[in-house]
Amino acid sequence: MALSIEEETTLGDEFFAQVQKYFTVVEDDFLNDYINRVGKYLSEAIEVNPFPFRFYILKDGSLNAFAAPGGRIFIFTGLITETDRLPELAAVICHELGHVSARHLSARVDQGKKIGLATLAGILAGVLIGGPAAGAIITGTMAAGIQTQLHYSRNDEREADQLGFSYMRSAGLDPGSMVSVLSKIERGRWMGTDKVPAYLLTHPTGPERMANIDTLTREHPDLAQREEALRLAEEYPFFRASVLALHMDSSDAMRSFRAEIKKNPESAPGYYGLGLIMKQRADFAVASEYLSRAMRYAPHSAAVSRGLAEMYQSSGNTEDAIALLNKVLEKDRDDKAALFILAGCYQSKEEHEKAVSIYERLKAFPPVRDDVFHNLGVSYGKLDRLSHAHFNFGFFFKKKGDMRMARFHFEKARELSAGDKEMLERIEKALQPKPRGN
């Protein structure tokens, strides 16, 4: 018998709290928007799902990805950078969607819920995450017995592969990529004879599993192209380059981008990645050169335009940044990454009304970056709207888990909001404990 929907929701929230203790959840509008667009596109083939799917990137070099209770799916930066094409990443996500839609984890977890959902969440996090963090997460004498029953069986893997294959075909993506990405994960054993990639510890693999996928691919050779798949595939090299440049070792990333450019001197993702690294190092002249080359080879890439605009902003050239961002927003007015950079440009120009307008708009597009609340607090303060400034600083600290500072700012906001019934109600609501998983 599987967990009830309510139980799985609670377990999912507890699980997410464990993940946040041990890992950095990537906060990047472009990366989060892209991974959720991909995930939601792939999940369209699932007819019934009791939970909204949410996709997260964890900053960690491990070759790992996993589905957690309550519809959350986590992908590690290390696995993203090992994939070369969208279909390889999609294959991993579709496999995890298969586990979710078949309720594999829910059925296994139900057997252990007698120990309490909070304790179970910790054990489950250790099982799925693996690696050095697992030992710290899994505690208590009951863990060992329960730990083994939480791993997926070979039958679970077979069913998830079959479902994942179906989702890949529905999305118009090559299901054969399931074999190529599994081969890459298998090769991850180079880390050492006693160190198996975390993904393989919870997802049994082997020649039989790969042969089954290969057979399915040969039996269903025809594949219909879909426009959204083509759009996502076109953006993928820039998504991967961003992950590699901003969230992996920069020296390794530089070598990778230079090798890519050596193979293809007109590699826009290669120059884009180098530009991001040099911007991080505050070498704006070199960053500008690389990003301008990327723009020359990919003039319609929103990612490259945003990268160049952010470099302009960082180097104090806000007017050029604003002009470039407005071009991006002409094509997609809800581009969160472009809006965030644009708001920062207006802040640096002391045009705080414009900055506030954009940041308030960004609050309507979850997940909301923590620094949206911080920056709103700054701009409201500059406008002498102090109750709103303290209110947003309160939210910033609440999201960071610092309830002492959060209460200080919420109380200050309450003092300054006498007579404003709507604002006082918002403050009272904000003073309630933070819902898990936000």
What residue spans do the PLM features occupy?
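Catalytic Zn2+-binding segment of zinc metalloproteases
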Residues: 87, 97-114
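Terminal, low-structured helical/coil segments at or just beyond the last alpha-helical repeat
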Residues: 382, 391-438
